[in-house]
């Protein structure tokens, strides 16, 4: 499809591109056109770039023929100064007020460019519960807290989202793909009052749900073949990916998953995937205590939502966490040592294996090795270091004692006589109510954009209870303390059932509120959840939604270990992916780069020029959406494309412009331009 000659109708572009001129640039560097084709992170086992799906380099003049002002792009300025690439690290996102205001501004910018809701999108059944501050008026646990709090604050909530928007939103959130056109129409036509809950059950029990949440927990547990400290190899990634996938598919309780991560035994990380979690948390280049400390910090962040536990692994909290954490400011380094001591008798050891012409390693875990093999792991946490990645560990800091016995700092308990240390730690962590709070809050953030505690990995244990509020000037950390407590209690009572928790969240009226808001919006209301905050789709979601809607299924060869994949949500890791399209939407590497939601010029260029899009909008591709639709009338074709790509009918203005365009010039070319434009619209790129 040619765009270089400026064929694309300006009026069509004006209507179909919802531009809001908003571009994040917290930290940027200028890159030239010759750097657009960045390959994926290269390693010894990286698969080759696939030409059919790779980004194609185009001139800035070509890019200028499409309206990319949605990403804040001015093509004349781009031609003069190059393109800006967002670069942000995990540590940049600690300012929760800043995060909230960015989300709120983004939501206002996006929703201001969405089309007005057509009459056909009106809800066809009574859904509104009675308003009031009586929790008994609300059947959903979440609504019993959200709506009385809104009433007390004097903040009117947004109205309920339409059926068209709901099916798209919940399908993306639960499965990582947009819904099929026929499913949209059948859902909207259904007049039964329980159709939303039945749709939720359908999605939660789908194979695509397993794909989406295997990717999510792979991110959370940082399942990668290589990080800055250790190499787990693709076989290790695949083994852990399979363990996560099987755990979710079989409904394994989340506390059991956590116990297996902490207490796993095995000799081969290529066969027992959970081994890779502890191994991946190792720290090389220093004494064995560095390994133990890093694994302890990983456990605190992933399972307790307390990343700042890592801070007291180097020093007391005083002078470092005073303004950040009421608990942390008084926490002692010796408490970290007590916690780390649970892992002090666990050694990760490597076994060399030859695969083809290369030598690599698989890992095993063993407790208290035979004397003479590795004497470091025969005792409790030892205070005998002056070098390494952390400050000295010396007896003087612990009353002259040379070892520190294991004590779980939040309960004061240690292992029973003869009890395996890691088994004892697994029991302490999963019976700690903070484990349930963290699990619930991590998932809440995925559905609402921000956590009840936000950031979700920075819990302060002394600021969570509204019945025991912290002393001034400290304030309660959760936006809704009672909701967080009751939701965590419900999670425990229902057997740590992840599906049950998600079902409660998406069936709540709070989740089903519109992202549009009538009246003046105050960004401080974000934490009241008075409207749905928008989010940009993950790179994997965009890829799979384009693939599904177009009907053109790719065949990616990820190499001998990972095999062949068609869907990005099934890629075993995020560091190595076969298409740059996904990487440019900031999917992270599960190490130092977290998954981000920012937008960038690079993303705009991908949506306009990458083969993932352009190869799927051509009328000549017999397997494609257009080739299968060109026998329709113009009216039918426009409706069909909008429903297939955007899960809604076009507005009257959109339809009039699109039909007029199809009636002039070459119909096939105009149809290609229309489909290409839909893939570049705000309401395709964002989940709202």
Q: How should these model regions be labeled?
A:
Residues 10-11, 69, 312:
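Secreted/luminal cysteine- and crosslink-motif detector
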Residues 488-492:
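Alpha-helical support elements that line or immediately flank enzyme active sites
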Residues 65-66, 118-361, 436-474, 478-485, ...:
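Short, structured secondary-structure elements
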Residues 647:
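Conserved, function-critical positions that sit in or immediately flank catalytic
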Residues 20-49:
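Signal peptide processing junction and immediate N-terminal pro/mature segment
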Residues 39, 43, 51-53, 58-167, ...:
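Short, functional "switch" segments adjacent to catalytic/cofactor/reactive centers
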Residues 2-28:
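Sec-dependent N-terminal signal peptides
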């Amino acid at each position: 499809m040619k765009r270089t000659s400026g064929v694309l109708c300006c009026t069509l572009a004006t209507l179909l591109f919802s531009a809001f001129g908003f571009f994040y640039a917290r930290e940027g560097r200028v890159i030239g056109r010759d750097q657009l084709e960045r390959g994926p992170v290269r390693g010894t086992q990286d698969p080759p770039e696939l030409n059919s799906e790779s980004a194609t380099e185009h001139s800035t003049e070509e890019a200028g023929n499409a309206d990319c002002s949605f990403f804040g792009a001015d093509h004349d300025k781009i031609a003069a100064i190059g393109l800006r690439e967002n670069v942000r690290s995990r540590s940049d996102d600690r300012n929760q007020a800043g995060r909230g205001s960015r989300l709120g501004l983004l939501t206002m910018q996006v929703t201001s460019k969405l089309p007005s809701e057509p009459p056909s999108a009106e809800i066809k059944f009574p859904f509104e519960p009675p308003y009031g501050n009586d929790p008994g008026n609300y059947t959903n646990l979440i609504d019993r807290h959200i709506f009385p709090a809104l009433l007390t604050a004097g903040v009117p909530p947004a109205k309920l989202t339409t059926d068209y928007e709901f099916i798209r939103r919940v399908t993306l959130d639960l499965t990582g793909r947009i819904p099929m056109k026929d499913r949209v129409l059948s859902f909207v036509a259904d007049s039964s009052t329980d159709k939303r809950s039945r749709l939720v059950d359908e999605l939660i029990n789908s194979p695509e749900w397993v794909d989406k949440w295997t990717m999510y927990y792979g991110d959370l547990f940082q399942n990668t073949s290589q990080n800055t400290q250790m190499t787990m190899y693709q076989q290790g990634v695949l083994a852990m990916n399979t363990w996560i996938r099987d755990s979710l598919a079989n409904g394994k309780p989340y506390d059991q998953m956590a116990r297996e991560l902490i207490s796993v035994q095995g000799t081969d990380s290529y066969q027992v995937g959970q081994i890779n979690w502890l191994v991946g948390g190792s720290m090389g280049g220093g004494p064995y205590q560095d390994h133990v400390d890093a694994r302890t910090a990983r456990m605190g962040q992933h399972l307790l939502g307390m990343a700042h536990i890592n801070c007291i692994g180097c020093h007391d909290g005083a002078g470092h966490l005073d303004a950040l954490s009421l608990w942390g400011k008084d926490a002692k380094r010796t408490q970290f040592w007590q916690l780390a001591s649970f892992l002090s008798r666990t050694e990760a050891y490597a076994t060399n294996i030859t695969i083809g012409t290369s030598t690599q390693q698989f890992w095993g875990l063993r407790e208290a090795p035979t004397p003479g093999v590795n004497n470091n792991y025969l005792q409790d946490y030892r205070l005998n270091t002056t070098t390494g990645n952390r400050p000295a560990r010396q007896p003087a800091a612990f009353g002259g004692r040379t070892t520190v016995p294991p004590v779980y700092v939040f309960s004061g308990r240690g292992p029973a006589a003869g009890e395996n240390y890691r088994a004892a730690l697994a029991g302490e962590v999963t019976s700690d109510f903070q484990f349930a709070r963290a699990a619930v809050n991590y998932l809440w953030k995925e559905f609402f954009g921000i956590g009840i505690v936000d950031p979700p990995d920075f819990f302060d244990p002394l600021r969570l209870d509204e019945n025991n509020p912290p002393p001034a000037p400290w304030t309660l950390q959760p936006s809704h303390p009672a909701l967080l407590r009751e939701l965590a209690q419900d999670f425990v009572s229902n057997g740590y059932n992840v599906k049950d928790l998600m079902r409660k969240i998406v069936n709540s009226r709070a989740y089903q509120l519109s992202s549009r808001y009538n009246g003046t919006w105050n960004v401080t209301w974000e934490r009241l959840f008075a409207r749905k905050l928008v989010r940009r789709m993950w790179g994997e979601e965009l890829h799979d939604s384009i693939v599904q809607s177009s009907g053109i299924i790719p065949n990616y060869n990820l190499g001998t270990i990972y095999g062949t994949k068609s869907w990005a949500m099934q890629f075993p890791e995020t560091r190595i992916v076969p298409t740059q399209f996904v990487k440019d939407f900031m999917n992270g590497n599960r190490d130092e780069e977290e998954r981000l939601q920012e937008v960038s010029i690079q993303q705009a260029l991908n949506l306009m020029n990458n083969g993932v899009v352009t190869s799927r909008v051509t009328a000549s591709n017999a397997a494609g959406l257009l080739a299968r639709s060109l026998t329709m009338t113009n009216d039918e074709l426009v409706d069909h494309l909008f429903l297939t790509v955007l899960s809604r009918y076009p507005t009257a203005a959109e339809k009039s412009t699109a039909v007029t365009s199809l009636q002039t010039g070459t119909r096939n070319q105009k149809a290609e331009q229309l489909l290409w434009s839909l893939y570049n619209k705000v309401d395709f790129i964002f989940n709202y």
